[in-house]
Amino acid sequence: MREATVYLLRIPGAGELPLSRRERERKAVESIIREVFGPEAALHHDDNGAPYLDGTATGTFISVSHSASTACVAVRNGSAVGVDIETGRSQLRSVAARFLSPDEQAIFTSDTALLTAWTSKEAAFKAASEPRLVISDIRLSSDMTSAATPSGQRFALFHHPIGDSSMITIAIPYA
C-alpha cells in the first residue's frame, strides 16, 4: 500500500510574527506536529539530519519541508516517506546541471518540469535516507512517476501543484 498523509500550514509573514524566516518555519512545523500528534510529540533529527518523533507510535515516519509561505509534514506508518514543497523560481534553470543528469537535462526543459524534477529528487533523497547519496545520482523516469537511487531503492512519486507556481512531491518506497 502506498499511503501517506500530508499536512500543510501557511507560514506567517514577518509582519504577523516578528521572527526570522527560519524561526517562523520551525514554529509552523512544530504547530503541525503538536496538532497531529499531541503535545507529547517531540521533533528531533538523526545524525543524517532526517526528522523523527519521540512520543509517537513506533514505525511512524515523517518528512518535513517548507517553502517561503507553507510548511509541510508528510506522515507514513510502516516505511519511509519523503516530501518536498517548492515555489518555482528562475534559479532552477541555472542550477539544473547540479541536480539533473545530462539525459534528464535534455528531457526536463520547461520551468514546470524543472520544478517537478527538483521536488522529485528532493523527496526521493529524503525517503532514501542513504548516507553519501548525492541528489544528482537519483534517476527519474521520463514521466517523473518514479525515482531510483544507485543502491537500487525505488520510489513512487506523487506530484501536487499548489496555485500557479508551487509544487509538492511525495516519494514513497516501492515494496
What is each PLM-predicted segment?
Residues 1-175:
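Core catalytic alpha/beta fold that binds nucleotide/phospho-ligands
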